[in-house]
Amino acid sequence: MIKEYRTIKEVVGPLMAVEKVSGVKYEELIEVRMQNGEIRRGQVLEVQEDKAMVQIFEGTSGINLKNSSVRFLGHPLQLGVSEDMIGRVFDGLGRPKDNGPEILPEKYLDINGEVINPIARDYPDEFIQTGISAIDHLNTLVRGQKLPVFSGSGLPHKELAAQIARQATVLDSSDDFAVVFAAIGITFEEAEFFMEDFRQTGAIDRSVMFMNLANDPAIERIATPRMALTAAEYLAYEKGMHVLVIMTDMTNYAEALREISAARREVPGRRGYPGYLYTNLATLFERAGRIRGLKGSVTQIPILTMPEDDKTHPIPDLTGYITEGQIILTRELYKSGIQPPIDVLPSLSRLKDKGTGAGKTREDHAATMNQLFAAYAQGKQAKELAVVLGESALSDIDKIYAKFAERFENEYVNQGFYTNRTITETLDLGWELLAMLPRTELKRIKDDLLDKYLPEGK
């Protein structure tokens, strides 16, 4: 039953306190009817006895305490879902933003989703090809995984996000694949970049986009990733599609949480973020996965900018605890002109060994991955030594490793944002680079694989 009250007690920032209420639930949707007839929407953030704290999506400016009324709608924020969402652009609250018609929903779903029973989860073990060598070969993404990208302010993470959205696919052509893209608190220029890129490259045809701009209300920023994940779960578990969810920028999401927490006068945690930041992020990231008996899957790539490039900042720190690895972009590689500037050594995909090998990628995947890691690490060490002691201090084998590291960065990692490599092309390129080294140095690869794949004459 919808209830209406005229008992607004206080307005503070985006928050409004309503008293003498009954039967109100956490996260229930509300409508505020103002004295001029305007209607604004909001959400219940807290309930104590007969008092409710609500946040207004459009802000509280102009609300008159005596002449405004509040209606509690009896349900949480919902998203109307349908397969017709594919190819469309929505705002952070799921309203069409592309001048297209309203979606005719098949059903309405609570954006908070439902917890996946751990027993019902299926283990992620199928390869997703992004077309980016540093990810596909060395930090493999598998269906159902959550693999974040840790970037820094000014680094090209938006170009990387667009590239993954364009290029990502599953190798089995019979499987339906879709991308759900959530832009959180981005600038107007960034929004234009994403929409233009998706339209020009045709990526929009298999994508659902949710765009929340920096000047939109903070509460909408909280809702945007939940809208995206609700759409993804519908496409995955009810329509049998493999869905990749890209969310950028999760730092803006955490800042919105901090803003709301401060308005509620909560006791702050580390660096002013609320003490529940970890559990709140987990409610998003744990919605990735596969369910036994269902065909579809939800894979997540959340992208965040590390304030001051600090990996120990609460946002990347807590994200790392919840997710299954990280892809790290570095300023050093970016300044060297490497695009995308992925530093493969500190990057990690904890599930990479589950989605590789014969029948998934190729039999030589794991061995060449380990050898490339070892050779690049040794090459970087040799280059650092040459800076300190001079190149003449290097042994002959160290000079080879230093050249290997240089070629690895310039040819393997530096593929640009519009080159789409298949996993076969990436593996072959890895062998071409490993052929620089004496065969005796390739100790992490079995002889039968060396005989089969190492280029002639090595």
Swiss-Prot record:
Expression induction: By increasing intracellular Na(+) concentration.
GO molecular function: ATP binding; proton-transporting ATP synthase activity, rotational mechanism
Gene Ontology biological process terms from the UniProt entry: proton motive force-driven plasma membrane ATP synthesis; sodium ion transport
Disulphide-bridged cysteine pairs: none
Keyword annotations from UniProtKB, A to Z: Ion transport, Sodium, Sodium transport, Transport
Chain segments annotated as coiled-coil in the UniProt record: none
Function summary: Involved in ATP-driven sodium extrusion.
Family to which this protein belongs: Belongs to the ATPase alpha/beta chains family.
Protein name: V-type sodium ATPase subunit B
Organism: Enterococcus hirae (strain ATCC 9790 / DSM 20160 / JCM 8729 / LMG 6399 / NBRC 3181 / NCIMB 6459 / NCDO 1258 / NCTC 12367 / WDCM 00089 / R)
